[in-house]
């Protein structure tokens, strides 16, 4: 069972429950050698740091003394780990040696027998440099083994959860096919396999594309494990692309070769030995100088170096979790990807998939948008803004430029004449910023350095296309000046209320429809904050319809506002339909759980304000969804909507 608690980009801070044990994602599974004598780092430390580990059932199966202990006392006793134990099936050995001495069903039976929490099918790992014909034939065999494994578990009543590994080599259409076929089977976790050769060769562009082409066709309600990814420098990008689990043998393997892991790359202890101190404050690095560690006996040096590598690995995972909570995961990704040019390739290629990524990225975040380089131009926040500009119902448009020194929000620092013309400011990052919505996230909640000339030109094509699309409504400067002069001569009673007009445009941008018609425009009023002087509420006959949330200026409906949205928005827009059995709970304002969602607006994005209705489209409640439209239909566990209020009968 998987539940999302917080999110940013496609990264998910979540909770997996397996056999009554909980794993917080994203997380790393340290690889544990099934032979305790060969385990580099003590299991006492592993038990303190990890919620989940991964070990090899094939080595256990083929080593008589290990097999005997595992079969009599269980895998947890063998490796001395109390929480969730995942096992590989021998697929790695198959990829290295070309053959294994165990059958696909035999290894499933064995994993169940030794009490594994999450087992793995014996799939066929297909490297990146094989022919398409070979990749296709391997995939067909993996599908057969997967189907047989699921059938075996069901027929035998096995309790173990199962990994269904996605294969397909470097062929993206085969990765898609693998995800589609495997996704229809009842697997609990979906590892993306055979990417280690790509990572070893720094082919991060291909790694990113393999992840995305798999994610697009996998069920959203199941965790995704990037098999073999153990270097912390790749975690942030992989999490941002939707990976929840990683496994690391790197902490031990690198230590044996004297390699010192950092979040930005790998250093060699031999090259560091003359430094006064380590660039780390973990227990190992605090107690030893580089020279002291380097001069230790080999076995002890390897153990301590492995401990450091494990510390820095978990530290990066914790840093990513915090970034998800704070809403600045993209900034961390951009920072990490600048640590190596090949990683930057991985970041740049994802712009091709922004239509997919944007669907998972929250519409609003705790942190502002920080521009850290040219790649920031392709972030989902900007992509979404450009798409949603077409939600605004324009009558007359004037496009202009402002001085680079003009502070945001623009409308507070320009002498703009109030009228019913939509004035759009050319913006180097966001393309166009309508003055009437310029306080909404992320248009005012951003920090951008002085742009280079080539960056300033990035949005020229977008602006030209927008103007061409709306050419009949575009005013030139002479017409605009004539119009505002003419408008200024109108009687006060004939003029629009600029604050109400502004809020109307904000509602269009946020909800994609005209919420305030002409009649309402004359009836509603705004109320400004006494502290900031900014618009805080929209009212109808002294009753609050919407509150402009201070941090992002999104319009949050009160009960009457929700009723207005329900009236103005056509079904299924911004709706979530729930089962009749929980109608009364919704009316009472209690959270809506995923398993009770029957239908929804497929275009919903995470953290949008939604209307909760029954099958007759009767408004029951209103609140915020943590899931997008597709996820709402696929998740069957955890909270779907946090309600702000319910409508009692």
From Swiss-Prot:
<feature type="binding site">
    <location>
        <position position="285"/>
    </location>
    <ligand>
        <name>Zn(2+)</name>
    </ligand>
</feature>
<dbReference type="InterPro" id="IPR036511">
    <property type="entry name" value="TGT-like_sf"/>
</dbReference>
<dbReference type="GO" id="GO:0008270">
    <property type="term" value="F:zinc ion binding"/>
</dbReference>
<keyword id="KW-0819">tRNA processing</keyword>
<feature type="binding site">
    <location>
        <position position="123"/>
    </location>
    <ligand>
        <name>substrate</name>
    </ligand>
</feature>
<dbReference type="InterPro" id="IPR029402">
    <property type="entry name" value="TGT_C2"/>
</dbReference>
<keyword id="KW-0862">Zinc</keyword>
<dbReference type="Pfam" id="PF01702">
    <property type="entry name" value="TGT"/>
</dbReference>
<dbReference type="InterPro" id="IPR038370">
    <property type="entry name" value="ArcTGT_C1_sf"/>
</dbReference>
<dbReference type="GO" id="GO:0002099">
    <property type="term" value="P:tRNA wobble guanine modification"/>
</dbReference>
<feature type="binding site">
    <location>
        <position position="280"/>
    </location>
    <ligand>
        <name>Zn(2+)</name>
    </ligand>
</feature>
<comment type="pathway">
    <text>tRNA modification; archaeosine-tRNA biosynthesis.</text>
</comment>
<feature type="domain" description="PUA">
    <location>
        <begin position="573"/>
        <end position="648"/>
    </location>
</feature>
<dbReference type="Pfam" id="PF01472">
    <property type="entry name" value="PUA"/>
</dbReference>
<dbReference type="InterPro" id="IPR002478">
    <property type="entry name" value="PUA"/>
</dbReference>
<keyword id="KW-0479">Metal-binding</keyword>
<dbReference type="InterPro" id="IPR015947">
    <property type="entry name" value="PUA-like_sf"/>
</dbReference>
<comment type="similarity">
    <text>Belongs to the archaeosine tRNA-ribosyltransferase family.</text>
</comment>
<dbReference type="Pfam" id="PF14810">
    <property type="entry name" value="TGT_C2"/>
</dbReference>
<feature type="binding site">
    <location>
        <position position="194"/>
    </location>
    <ligand>
        <name>substrate</name>
    </ligand>
</feature>
<dbReference type="InterPro" id="IPR036974">
    <property type="entry name" value="PUA_sf"/>
</dbReference>
<dbReference type="GO" id="GO:0005737">
    <property type="term" value="C:cytoplasm"/>
</dbReference>
<dbReference type="InterPro" id="IPR002616">
    <property type="entry name" value="tRNA_ribo_trans-like"/>
</dbReference>
<feature type="binding site">
    <location>
        <position position="282"/>
    </location>
    <ligand>
        <name>Zn(2+)</name>
    </ligand>
</feature>
<dbReference type="InterPro" id="IPR038250">
    <property type="entry name" value="TGT_C2_sf"/>
</dbReference>
<dbReference type="InterPro" id="IPR004804">
    <property type="entry name" value="TgtA"/>
</dbReference>
<dbReference type="InterPro" id="IPR050076">
    <property type="entry name" value="ArchSynthase1/Queuine_TRR"/>
</dbReference>
<dbReference type="GO" id="GO:0003723">
    <property type="term" value="F:RNA binding"/>
</dbReference>
<keyword id="KW-0808">Transferase</keyword>
<protein>
    <recommendedName>
        <fullName>tRNA-guanine(15) transglycosylase</fullName>
        <ecNumber>2.4.2.48</ecNumber>
    </recommendedName>
</protein>
<keyword id="KW-0328">Glycosyltransferase</keyword>
<comment type="function">
    <text>Exchanges the guanine residue with 7-cyano-7-deazaguanine (preQ0) at position 15 in the dihydrouridine loop (D-loop) of archaeal tRNAs.</text>
</comment>
<feature type="active site" description="Nucleophile">
    <location>
        <position position="88"/>
    </location>
</feature>
<dbReference type="GO" id="GO:0016763">
    <property type="term" value="F:pentosyltransferase activity"/>
</dbReference>
């Amino acid at each position: 069972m998987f539940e999302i608690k917080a999110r940013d980009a496609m990264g998910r801070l979540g909770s997996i429950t397996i056999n009554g044990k909980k794993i917080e994602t994203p997380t790393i599974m340290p690889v544990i050698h099934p032979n305790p004598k060969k385990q580099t780092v003590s299991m006492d430390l592993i038990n303190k740091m990890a919620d989940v580990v991964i070990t090899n059932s094939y080595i256990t199966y083929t080593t008589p003394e290990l097999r005997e202990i595992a079969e009599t006392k269980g895998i947890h006793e063998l490796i001395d780990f109390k929480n969730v134990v995942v096992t590989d099936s021998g697929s790695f050995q198959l990829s290295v040696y070309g053959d294994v001495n165990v059958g696909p069903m035999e290894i499933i039976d064995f994993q169940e027998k030794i009490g594994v929490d999450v087992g793995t099918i014996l799939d066929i790992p297909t490297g990146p440099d094989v022919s398409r014909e070979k990749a296709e034939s391997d995939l067909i065999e993996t599908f057969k083994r997967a189907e047989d494994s699921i059938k075996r578990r069901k027929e035998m009543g096995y309790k173990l959860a199962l990994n269904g590994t996605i294969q397909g080599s470097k062929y993206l259409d085969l990765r898609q096919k693998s995800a589609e076929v495997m996704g229809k089977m009842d697997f609990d976790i979906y590892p993306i396999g055979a990417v280690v050769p790509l990572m070893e060769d720094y082919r991060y562009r291909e790694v990113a594309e393999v992840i995305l082409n798999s994610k697009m066709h996998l069920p959203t309600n199941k965790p995704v494990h990037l098999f073999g990814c153990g270097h912390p420098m790749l975690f942030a990008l992989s999490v941002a692309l939707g990976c929840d689990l990683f496994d690391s043998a790197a902490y031990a393997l690198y230590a044996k070769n004297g390699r010192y892991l950092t979040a930005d790359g790998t250093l060699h202890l031999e090259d560091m030995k003359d430094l006064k101190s380590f660039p780390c404050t973990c227990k190992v690095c605090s107690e030893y100088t580089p020279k002291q560690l380097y001069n230790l006996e080999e076995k002890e040096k390897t153990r301590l170096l492995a401990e450091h590598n494990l510390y820095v690995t978990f530290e990066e995972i914790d840093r990513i979790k915090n970034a998800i909570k704070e809403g600045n995961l993209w900034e961390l990704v951009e920072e990490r990807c600048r640590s190596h040019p090949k990683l930057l390739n991985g970041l740049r290629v994802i712009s091709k998939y922004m239509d997919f990524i944007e669907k998972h990225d929250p519409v609003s975040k705790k942190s502002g948008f920080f521009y850290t380089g040219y790649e920031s131009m392709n972030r989902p926040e900007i992509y979404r803004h450009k798409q949603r500009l077409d939600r605004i119902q324009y009558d007359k448009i004037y496009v202009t430029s402002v001085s680079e020194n003009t502070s945001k929000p623009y409308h507070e620092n320009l002498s703009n004449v109030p009228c019913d013309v939509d004035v759009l400011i050319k913006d180097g990052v966001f393309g166009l910023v309508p003055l009437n919505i310029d306080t909404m996230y992320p248009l005012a909640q951003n920090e951008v350095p002085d742009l280079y000339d080539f960056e300033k030109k990035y949005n020229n094509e977008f602006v030209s296309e927008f103007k061409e699309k709306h050419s009949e409504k575009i005013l030139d400067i002479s017409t605009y000046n004539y119009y505002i002069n003419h408008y200024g001569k109108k009687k006060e009673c004939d003029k629009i209320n600029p604050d109400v007009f502004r809020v109307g445009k904000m509602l269009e941008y946020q909800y994609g429809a005209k919420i305030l018609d002409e009649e309402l425009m004359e009836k509603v009023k705004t109320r400004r904050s006494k502290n900031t002087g900014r618009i805080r509420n929209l009212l109808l006959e002294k009753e609050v319809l919407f509150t402009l949330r201070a941090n992002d200026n999104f319009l949050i409906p009160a009960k009457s506002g929700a009723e207005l949205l329900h009236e103005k928005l056509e079904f299924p827009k911004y709706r979530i339909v729930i089962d009749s059995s929980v109608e009364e709970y919704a009316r009472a304002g209690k959270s809506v759980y995923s398993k009770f969602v029957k239908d929804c607006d497929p275009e919903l994005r995470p953290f949008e304000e939604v209307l909760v209705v029954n099958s007759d489209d009767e408004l029951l409640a209103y609140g915020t969804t943590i899931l997008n439209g597709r996820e709402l239909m696929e998740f069957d566990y955890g909270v779907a909507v946090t309600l702000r209020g319910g409508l009692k009968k």
